[in-house]
Design a protein with these regions (language model features):
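Short, flexible loop motifs at catalytic/binding sites
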Residues: 1-112
Length: 112
């Protein structure tokens, strides 16, 4: 995840937004390492498969793999997808992720 995307999701989470990052599991710990220094963190969880960062504002960043079962039960204001990893699955992913952001009238953001 590049620093511009990271800065944006930190600001949104600090502002109370719920963000779901769809990234490969091998990237999650690296991203969390970069998030550690952000201000306003209430909880930083590194448990494999349950990684998340919650902010005092009520916002947070959770992580999921692109498998359907990994995304079940999530709701978010913003979904961020690294399309380099999931370009071949993008059509299916957008269909699955629309359900996650539907309740909040949120947005899906892809980046390379």
């Amino acid at each position: 995840m590049n620093r511009y995307v990271l800065e944006g999701i930190i600001r949104d989470a600090q502002a109370g937004k719920r963000i779901l990052c769809v990234v490969p599991s091998r990237e999650v710990q690296h991203i969390i390492d970069q998030l550690e220094s952000a201000s306003g963190i209430a909880l930083l969880r590194r448990s494999h498969g349950d990684e998340r960062v919650l902010f005092t504002s009520g916002g947070g960043i959770t992580f999921a793999h692109a498998r359907r079962e990994a995304m079940r039960g999530h709701s978010a204001d913003i979904v961020v997808i690294d399309d380099v990893y999931y370009l071949d699955q993008m059509f299916r992913l957008h269909a699955d992720l629309k359900v996650i952001v539907a309740a909040a009238s949120g947005e899906i953001i892809t980046y390379t």
